[in-house]
A protein has these predicted regions:
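Ordered hydrophobic segments in well-structured contexts
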Residues: 1-5, 31-35, 50-52
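Residues that cap or initiate secondary-structure elements
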Residues: 10, 38-40, 100
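Intrinsically disordered, low-complexity boundary segments flanking structured domains
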Residues: 1, 18-22, 37-42, 79-81
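Generic recognition of long tandem-repeat/solenoid scaffolds
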Residues: 20-37, 86-97
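Extended Gly/Ser/Thr-rich low-complexity repeat segments
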Residues: 36-60
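Short, intrinsically disordered N-terminal pre-domain segments
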Residues: 1-25
Length: 114
């Protein structure tokens, strides 16, 4: 099972990515589909959000329950909040993206001048 992890909270989710998102200035992006209200999503998914993808699986080990394994991938580089699409079935999709090269250069110039 795949989860979105924000701080210590995990949300079941489907997550896909694009190296070049032509619908969003050509930036790399991740689309996160989960069960949440639009108001909750707008509050949670903001610029600068640190988040990760968690995969949990139960691996057979000869016992009745098996052993749970967990892998986690940091996605803090995808920190630009994008559009929220309400599917009107209790789920929504949120886009989180990386800065474009131009945005990154402008950020660095701004930091150097500060």
């Amino acid at each position: 099972m795949i989860y979105l992890k924000v701080q210590e909270n995990e949300y079941p989710a489907y997550i896909s990515g694009r190296l070049i998102d032509r619908d969003w200035d050509g930036r790399a992006s991740k689309s996160i589909t989960l069960t949440m209200t639009p108001a909750q999503a707008a509050q949670l998914f903001t610029d600068g959000l640190g988040w990760s993808i968690v995969q949990r699986e139960t691996v057979p080990d000869g016992t009745d329950g098996g052993t749970e394994t967990m892998q986690e991938w940091d996605n803090a580089d995808y920190c630009v909040a994008g559009p929220i699409t309400d599917h009107r079935d209790g789920t929504l999709t949120v886009k989180m993206g990386k800065y474009t090269q131009l945005e990154e250069a402008l950020r660095q110039i701004g930091e150097a001048l500060a």
